[in-house]
Regions:
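Subset of outer-membrane beta-barrel
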Residues: 1-343
Length: 343
């Protein structure tokens, strides 16, 4: 999307506190720099840091408390190329480091690291007349975090990266030279295997050959059973590429459950002269898959190459969420404004 920017380059930072109803030291910070190299290409670099705050570890009543500071970090570099006047594609390379170890409890644990790739496409149409309305169509798609599994120790279980497929579209109502109303819609699918439902198989045999099946009993007098076996669904013990394709058909509840694994979101924005904006949005997730439902209100201001954006999150779910009442803040500095004219 940077390749459609009217600004030559820019630097942005954002800060989001999390779980403010419970603690005050968990937060997500992000730094981004982008540069539109020419009419056809742009690049960006970013750093994202998620702090889980301080965790106090007390092993027993006689030990001194130890402080651990788990965190996660990603570093990205991306490049986008304009393949046509209204269409571009991009690729991003990402390094991920997850340090969730509790060294005072497990000295053998270590920080885990991996890499991921994002592939994206974006379309931004020209201004057109649709009957009584002047408008512009926008659409995009992205696959995020394509990469190998991650694990925290040599003998530990490997974990999938949160690979996501996001597809969205929008329409800009160009009311006049100064006023624009935009509406957007987006769907998201997590591209990792759904955990299967497990069960056990028990052994019943005709031990004394009297024509009646007897319970298989071991030396402790307990029923003999197998290790857990898949009762419904498919095995999640696959590589990350197989997991992507499997994620569309492996829900234990069948197709109806697959549909519940899609989240969707709607958004609207009013913008005046590219200097002031009001925003509202809604996010929905099935109650069987996390029950996240949020309303968001936001505003943006731009003055002399500096943009400030604020948003506030409200929970709309019946299930209380620790993410509700979250305030998000971002600040962007543009350099070389209006160097490129797109409309």
């Amino acid at each position: 999307k940077y390749v459609f920017s009217e600004t030559k380059s820019g630097f942005g930072l954002s800060y989001t506190p999390y779980l403010t109803k419970l603690v005050n030291d968990i937060s997500l910070g992000n730094l981004t720099y982008f540069n539109r190299i020419n009419e056809r290409s742009a690049f960006a670099v970013s750093l994202r840091y998620f702090s889980l705050g301080e965790i106090e570890i007390i092993q027993d009543e006689f030990s001194q408390a130890l402080i651990e500071k788990p965190n996660e970090m990603t570093m990205d570099i991306s490049y986008s190329l304009r393949l046509a006047d209204q269409f571009s594609m991009g690729v991003a390379l990402r390094y991920l480091r997850s340090d969730l170890r509790i060294g005072s409890v497990d000295p053998d644990a270590k920080a885990a690291s991996s890499f991921g790739v994002d592939l994206s496409a974006y379309y931004q149409g020209e201004e057109q007349n649709f009957g009584d309305i002047d408008g512009r169509i926008r659409a995009g798609a992205i696959i995020q975090n394509l990469g190998p599994k991650i694990k925290y120790d040599e003998s530990g279980r490997e974990t999938f990266l949160p690979t996501n497929l996001r597809i969205g579209g929008g329409f800009d109502f160009l009311l006049d030279q100064y006023n624009t109303v935009s509406v957007t819609a987006e769907v998201n699918k997590l591209l990792v295997p759904t955990p299967p439902i497990l069960g056990r198989e028990y052994n019943f045999s005709d031990i004394n050959e009297n024509g009646v099946y007897d319970d298989g009993i071991d030396e402790l007098g307990e029923l003999v059973s197998t290790d857990p076996v898949i009762y419904q669904g498919q095995s999640a013990d696959v590589d990350f590429m197989s997991g992507i394709f499997q994620s569309f058909s492996d829900a234990p509840g069948g197709f109806s459950e697959e549909l519940k694994e899609f989240t969707w979101a709607l958004g609207a924005e009013y913008k005046y002269d590219d200097s002031f904006a009001l925003r509202a949005g809604y996010f929905n997730e099935s109650e069987e898959k996390g029950a996240r439902k949020f309303l968001a209100l936001g505003a943006g201001f731009k003055f002399s190459g500096t943009k400030v954006d604020l948003s506030y999150l409200f929970s709309a779910s019946k299930v209380p969420s620790p993410l509700e009442n979250t305030l998000r803040f971002s600040l962007t500095f543009d350099f070389g404004s209006n160097e490129y004219l797109e409309y």
